[in-house]
């Protein structure tokens, strides 16, 4: 049995997990050294959906780039939204969820194989068997078949709630009223109009934006009650020339969320890869994701993380505290909250968080031809934990004078080659390029593990 020594790396964020010695616990042990967060993707949108029963709190991160006066957001919603159901959320809350659930890189260091096994065993601390889950416009609207259901201001946003009889009239109304929507919106608006959905329309109030002191637009958060558990993404495809990335964080009191009208596939995980990837993790993850995306014919949602939010192992960021969970839209923590209230009042006693929030992180790369329908979600009671996790295993570089050390040394070339093959398969990178890079990572063991293999044997 191989024994491993684990140490902290300071590449990005270093968070201490639990020292793991028991083989049955190795699946989620190690130290976090890097993460593949949403910043890897230039056009990645992020959405939080907190869902319990038929109640949803939808938080939309605002990744708009350009002059704020040109900003317009049109979101189909299943019901008329009132002012008290809308708020602006702290921008940091999306970043916190992203950091907490991002795919991660962990590393291990082989211990000295010559250390007597019994002594190591006696000194090792067993890992737990299970982790604790620890006005004029209104007149023209009627002519166009558009009804203004509500009009109000929240934070830096002016918001209008619309219903429409036909998509052409809705498109005309939006353009006449100064909402700069892309050409071709009529075709994509039509299915939502036919299904009786309403439209949440927002633009920036420049005076209030300047008063706010913020440099960027804050996330909008909407609460509503509906049996429909969908995420309308088709409007985002109007001007898309390439595939777009969407990161969805679903928060539930029950367990994992899944998509019912598209397959959900776990992102490749728990792979041992060469140690040089530590300095190229962003490139690695982008290549690996694209390879898996093409392999699945570009029409699946990828599960990147699923976990009870009261714990993590290893932790890429600290779990969210109760106040942060509320900011993310979680409304069921306070047992005294009324079913009639879209959000729990902040004046109530702080809730006690146990295992009552489960996060599912889904990564969808979509195009109009492969994702013709909006994803439909459902909550499940499945609390199986999963994370995108990639393992670096550093070889022992000290002096080896025992039989176990010689056997360990003999096993390394095969291990390195397996890591190279795994990396090539995951990323579609050239195997020869991988081997050349690995030559620089073996360090003090030798200058070229495949070129000097026989010289290793000579010294045995």
What are the residue ranges of the model-derived segments?
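Bacterial N-terminal signal peptides that target proteins for export
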Residues: 1-12
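C-terminal segment of classical bacterial N-terminal signal peptides
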Residues: 15-25
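Long alpha-helical, hydrophobic tracts
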Residues: 22, 120-210, 435
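Accessory, solvent-exposed terminal regions and/or long lumenal/extracellular loops of proteins
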Residues: 26, 30-40, 181-422, 426, ...
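Short, compositionally biased low-complexity segments enriched in polar/charged residues
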Residues: 33-50, 135-147
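Surface-exposed, glycine/proline- and aromatic-rich loop segments on solvent-exposed faces
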Residues: 49-113, 170-191, 196
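Loop/turn elements at helix/coil->beta-strand transitions in domains of secreted/extracellular proteins
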Residues: 56, 155-159, 429-430
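A cross-kingdom signal targeting lumenal/periplasmic-facing segments of multi-pass membrane
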Residues: 87-154, 335-342, 346-351
């Amino acid at each position: 049995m191989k024994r491993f020594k684990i140490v902290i790396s300071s590449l990005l964020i270093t968070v201490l997990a639990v020292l793991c010695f028991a083989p049955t616990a190795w699946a989620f042990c190690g130290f976090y050294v890097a993460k593949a967060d949403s910043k890897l993707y230039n056009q990645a949108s992020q959405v939080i959906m907190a869902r319990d029963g038929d109640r949803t709190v939808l938080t939309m991160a605002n990744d708009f780039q350009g002059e704020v006066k040109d900003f317009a957001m049109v979101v189909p919603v299943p019901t008329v939204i009132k002012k008290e159901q809308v708020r602006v959320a702290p921008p940091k809350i999306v970043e916190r969820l992203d950091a907490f659930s991002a795919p991660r890189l962990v590393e291990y260091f082989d211990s000295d194989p010559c250390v007597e096994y019994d002594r190591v065993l006696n000194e090792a601390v067993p890992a737990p068997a299970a982790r604790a889950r620890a006005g004029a416009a209104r007149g023209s609207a009627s002519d166009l078949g558009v009804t203004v259901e509500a009009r109000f201001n929240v934070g830096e946003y002016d918001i209008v709630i619309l219903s429409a009889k036909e998509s052409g009239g809705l498109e005309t109304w939006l353009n006449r009223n100064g909402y700069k929507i892309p050409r071709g919106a009529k075709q994509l608006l039509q299915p939502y109009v036919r299904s009786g959905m309403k439209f949440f329309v927002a633009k920036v109030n420049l005076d209030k934006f300047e008063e706010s002191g913020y440099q960027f637009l804050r996330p909008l958060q909407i609460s509503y009650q509906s049996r429909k558990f969908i995420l309308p993404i088709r409007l985002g495809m109007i001007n898309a020339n390439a595939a777009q990335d969407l990161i969805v964080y679903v928060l539930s009191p029950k367990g994992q969320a899944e998509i019912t009208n598209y397959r959900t596939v776990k992102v490749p995980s728990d792979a041992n890869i060469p140690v040089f990837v530590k300095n190229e993790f962003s490139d690695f993850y982008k290549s690996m994701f694209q390879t898996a995306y093409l392999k699945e014919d570009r029409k699946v949602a990828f599960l990147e993380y699923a976990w009870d939010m009261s714990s993590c192992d290893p932790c890429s960021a600290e779990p969210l505290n109760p106040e942060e969970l509320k900011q993310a839209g979680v409304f069921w923590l306070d047992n005294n909250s009324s079913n009639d209230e879209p959000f729990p009042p902040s004046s109530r006693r702080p809730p006690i968080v146990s295992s009552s929030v489960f996060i599912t992180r889904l990564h969808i790369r979509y195009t109009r031809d492969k994702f013709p329908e909006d994803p439909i979600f459902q909550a499940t009671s499945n609390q199986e934990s999963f994370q995108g996790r990639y393992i670096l295993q550093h070889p022992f570089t000290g002096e080896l004078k025992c039989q176990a050390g010689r056997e360990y040394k003999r096993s390394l070339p095969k291990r390195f080659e397996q890591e190279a093959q795994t990396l090539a398969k995951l990323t579609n990178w050239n195997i020869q390029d991988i081997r050349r890079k690995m030559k620089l990572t073996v360090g003090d063991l030798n200058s070229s593990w495949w070129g000097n293999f026989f010289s290793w044997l000579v010294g045995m």
